[in-house]
C-alpha cells in the first residue's frame, strides 16, 4: 500500500454531530496541503445527520456486508461509499478513519476490528503518540459489517462521553488534535524520524451482557451506581453490575477479572447490550506491521 489518501468519515451515525463539526472546523483552520497524503472527507449518513437520528433503516456501521437489499437506505449508502472511496473505487483511499462519539465514559479511544497488520501499525502509532486505549473487537458474530473493514486499513476513533445531538467543544477539540497531526506522524514514521513502540496494549472483546429483564422482555434492573462511568476499570468477582427497583444487586460471578467498555451506551439498548467485557493483551509490534502498512 503506497499510502496516498486517507478517508475521514464523520456522521456515520446521524446523531453523532461533533465529528461533523470537527471536520468542518478542520477545513477552515488547517489549510496546509500535505504533498504526500491527501485527506478525503465525507459524511457517512447524510440523511440521518440531517434528521438528527442514528440511522434511517439500519445501522450504517453494520451495513458493509455481502447482503444486499436496495430498499434499505444504509445498504445503498454503504455501496456508494465503497464504490467511490473503496480501494477499487473511483476516488480510492488506502485508509479509512471513522469518527464516532459515545454516551459512555470511554474517553478518547481507538476501536479495531480484527487483527490486520496494517491496523496494528496505525493503532500503535496513535497509541504511542496520544496514549489512547484500544478496544479490539473481534469474534462477535452478532456484530459485523463495520465500515472500516471495507478498506485495506481502518480504525474507529471513539470519543465520549457526550449526549447525542449535543455539541461539546472539548470533544470537538480532541478530534481536531488527532486529525491535524495524523499525517505528520505517518510521514515521520515513513521517514524514520520516529519508531513504533515495541508493544501495543489492547483490550480484547470477550462478549457483551444485556440488562436484566422480566418475562415480558422489559428491563427490570439498571446499571449499578458503582459501575456508571467506570469504563476501562477492572471488575472482579462479586463486584456489582446491576441494581433492581428493590435495591437488590446483581454481581459479576466469574473468577476472571474483566475490563468493561461502552457501559450504558444509549444506542446499544436496542442491541440488547448494557456493557461489553474485555481482557487485556499485549501485542508485540513487528516489522511486518510496518512493512505491510507502507507496502
UniProtKB/Swiss-Prot annotation:
Catalytic activity line of the entry: an N-acyl-L-aspartate + H2O = a carboxylate + L-aspartate
Top enzyme category: hydrolase
Keyword Protein biosynthesis (UniProt): no
Gene Ontology MF terms: aspartoacylase activity; hydrolase activity, acting on ester bonds; zinc ion binding
EC number in record: 3.5.1.15
Cofactor(s) needed by this chain: Zn(2+)
Origin superkingdom: Bacteria
Cofactor info, note text: Binds 1 zinc ion per subunit.
Pfam family, one: AstE_AspA_cat
SUPFAM superfamilies: Zn-dependent exopeptidases (SSF53187)
A GO CC annotation given for this chain: cytosol
The keyword Zinc is assigned to this record: yes
Keywords: Hydrolase, Metal-binding, Zinc
Similarity remark: Belongs to the AspA/AstE family. Aspartoacylase subfamily.
PANTHER family from the UniProt entry: ASPARTOACYLASE (PTHR15162), SUCCINYLGLUTAMATE DESUCCINYLASE (PTHR15162:SF7)
Name of the protein in its database record: Probable aspartoacylase
Amino acid at each position: 500500500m503506497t499510502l496516498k489518501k486517507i478517508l475521514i468519515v464523520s456522521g456515520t451515525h446521524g446523531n453523532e454531530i461533533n465529528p461533523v463539526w470537527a471536520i468542518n472546523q478542520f477545513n477552515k483552520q488547517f489549510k496546509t496541503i500535505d504533498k504526500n497524503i491527501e485527506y478525503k472527507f465525507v459524511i457517512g449518513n447524510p440523511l440521518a445527520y440531517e434528521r438528527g437520528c442514528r440511522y434511517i433503516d439500519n445501522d450504517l456501521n453494520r451495513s458493509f456486508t455481502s447482503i444486499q437489499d436496495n430498499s434499505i437506505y444504509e445498504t445503498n449508502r454503504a455501496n456508494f461509499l465503497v464504490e467511490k472511496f473503496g480501494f477499487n473505487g473511483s476516488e480510492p483511499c488506502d485508509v479509512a478513519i471513522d469518527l464516532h462519539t459515545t454516551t459512555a465514559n470511554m474517553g478518547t479511544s481507538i476501536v479495531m476490528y480484527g487483527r490486520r497488520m496494517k491496523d496494528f501499525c496505525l493503532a500503535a502509532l496513535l497509541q504511542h503518540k496520544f496514549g489512547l486505549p484500544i478496544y479490539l473487537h473481534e469474534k462477535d458474530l452478532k456484530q459485523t459489517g463495520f465500515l472500516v473493514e471495507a478498506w485495506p486499513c481502518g480504525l474507529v476513533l471513539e470519543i465520549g462521553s457526550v449526549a447525542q445531538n449535543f455539541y461539546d467543544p472539548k470533544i470537538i477539540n480532541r478530534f481536531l488534535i488527532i486529525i491535524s497531526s495524523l499525517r505528520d506522524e505517518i510521514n515521520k514514521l515513513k521517514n524514520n524520524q520516529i519508531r513504533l513502540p515495541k508493544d501495543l496494549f489492547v483490550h480484547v472483546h470477550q462478549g457483551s451482557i444485556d440488562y436484566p429483564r422480566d418475562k415480558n422482555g422489559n428491563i427490570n434492573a439498571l446499571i449499578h451506581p458503582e459501575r456508571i462511568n467506570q469504563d476501562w476499570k477492572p471488575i472482579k468477582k462479586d463486584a456489582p453490575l446491576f441494581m433492581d427497583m428493590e435495591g437488590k444487586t446483581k454481581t459479576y460471578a466469574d473468577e476472571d477479572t474483566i475490563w468493561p467498555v461502552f457501559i450504558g451506551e444509549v444506542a446499544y439498548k436496542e442491541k440488547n447490550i448494557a456493557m461489553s467485557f474485555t481482557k487485556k493483551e499485549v501485542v508485540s509490534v513487528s516489522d511486518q506491521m510496518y512493512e505491510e502498512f507502507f507496502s
